Each structure stands twice: as C-alpha cells, then as structure tokens.
Amino acid sequence: MLIEGIFAAITTPFYPDERVYYRKLEANVARYSRSLLSGLIVLGSTGEAAELDDTETREVFRVAADAAAAEKVLVAGIGRESVRATIALAEAAAEARYDAVLVRTPTYYAPSMTPQAVATYYRSVADRSPLPVILYNIPRFVPYKIPVEMVAELAHHPNIIGIKDSSGDFNNLTALIATTQNAPRRTVTVTPVFEAVTARMLKPTAAQPDQATFVAASDLAGGTAVAAAPPAPALKTRTREVGFQVLTGSAAITLAALEAGAAGAILGFAACAPQACQEIYFAWKDHDQKLAADKQQRILAASQRIVNELGINGVKYACDFNGYYGGYARRPLLPLVASQKQEIESLLANIRN
C-alpha cells in the first residue's frame, strides 16, 4: 500500500454527554474528502482512540469509511494492550475496507515492554493482520521509544510497510530513513498517475437489479423493456516499487522530513488546517523551495501551540474555528479557558481552511 503525502489525523466529535456524535464525524470526513489530502487516520491519538471502547471503535471505523471518498487512503488506529485485542480491531478495519492499520506500543505493563517483548508484539500483530501495518512511535504518550535498530529489523517483515515517527526528533527521523534503506522493496498498485489505489476504489461497482430502468414503448420496436445500467468501467492501474515508508508526525518538521526522504506526514494539525499542510507538500513537489519554506514557517507557531501544548482540546477548538466539528474532548481531558480560545483564534487568523 502506498502511504505518501499529507494525512490528517482526524478528531472524534462527541455530544455534550460524551457519546460519539457520528453525524458530525460523517460530515467532517465528507469535507476532508473534498480536500487534496492523501488520506485520513481514524482513531489515532488525535481521535482519542484510548477513550473509546471496542463497540464505539468499530462503529467509528464504519461511519468514517462510508463517508470517505473512495480515493482517500484510510488508516485505522488499532493499538491495544494485547496482541489478540489488536488483531481483532485489525479485522474490524479490514471489514470496513480500510487500507492499513496504525499500531502503537502497549503501555500498561511498561516495565515489561523490553525490546524483545515489543518486537514480538509487532511481529505477532503483523503475522495475522489482514491489513498492512504501520508502526507508531509516539514517546510523548507511550513511555517507550521504538529503537531505530528494531525498526530496521521489523522493516523486513512483509506486512510491516512503514512507521509514523511522532518523536519530533529530526535526527531520529533521518536515522529511521537511513537504516531502512535496505528493507525489501514492495510492489504496490497505483493509478496511472502513480497515486494510491484504495480498497474502496477496487470495490465491485457492477449494476444491481434495482438499478434497472424502464424504456418507453415508443422508443422501441414494440413493447416495454427493462434496460440495466452497464457496469462501471474497470479501474485502470499500474504498479510501482516502494521501500519502507517513513512519515513524520510533527508538523514543525514536515518540510525537513520530505527533503530528507520521508514519504509524507501524518498530522494532527491537518485536522484543523488541511490546506495549510497540503501547501507545504505541493510546493515541495513542485521544487519551489522558497514557497515550501514560507508555507512551513506559516504553520510553525500555530501547530506547536495548538497541537503540542494545548493538546486534543486545542485541536478540537481549532477545528470549530475553521469550520469543522470539533467540540470537547472526553474527560479527564479538561476544556480550554477563554484566553486559550482567543489565542487559537489569533494563531489561525491567517490560516483559515
């Protein structure tokens, strides 16, 4: 699976009583689908995955997949505390026609999470996951930083295709890129313009019986006939060779990561400002270094303050301010105070997406 470009790590809207607000989730995903984002991360850290039970998680997967445009790559956050529970969610994501899964390291038994235990966890999940696995390194929330050497070894697993590095450490990112250069290259299916082909793009689209239409007798030699709509033309595809795909989870180093060889970025800031994040990527692809640097500088202060310092409620209020459904996070995360909301409005004054 090709995981390339800018991905939004989207939020999960809630009612005031903290039930999941599925209609607002649906509306958000539909709007993201009209953007130029490569895809969406559903129930990553920004989506408050740790706050949802398994029933809610499965329904969020389904609702988001049904609302997403077929060409958007969908990645499901499925990290749980056991191999068994993680695989169960991987299967649920596959049933909802996701394209890959994002897997964090277990945290509850942190003292027991030795390198051997962590590597065994990831290999065991990858062995049985019906979807490709993306490793998730986020030492800010998970008290375990996946060693570069371990990633280099796991990169040889046929079902582990990449890593999201949210350490914010550029040196760590470049080390990941360098040490996975020798990982086996994989053949992926892409469109004629080398963009990802998703599971939902490959979904059969042949006409169903209830799609038949009546043709008036006056238009025929005699009688009334039923004409079924023809099946949609087959999707044209080609193949492309890709290596182990390293993506940054830090908006502040998006441009530097791309220049260093990263495949893209998975950003919580893209949930509230997708266009601003995309503009960095497209300027870089167009080899306009000055414009790319300007676009990177434009989001620097806002992304740092909103995502890294104000956290989930900061991102959610920024979503509200920019026309998405944000709302409040589930407790124990505390809501923002008025001065913090005003600060976000000031930071986003010139980043209206």
Describe each region flagged by the PLM.
Residues 1-145:
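Active-site beta->alpha loop and helix N-cap motifs at the rims of alpha/beta catalytic domains
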Residues 8, 282, 316-320:
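Generic alpha-helical structural context detector
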Residues 23-27, 31, 59, 63, ...:
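A non-catalytic, amphipathic alpha-helix used as a structural packing/dimerization or gating element
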Residues 124-127, 139-298, 304:
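Catalytic alpha/beta core domains of metabolic enzymes, predominantly
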Residues 306, 310-353:
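C-terminal extensions of enzymes
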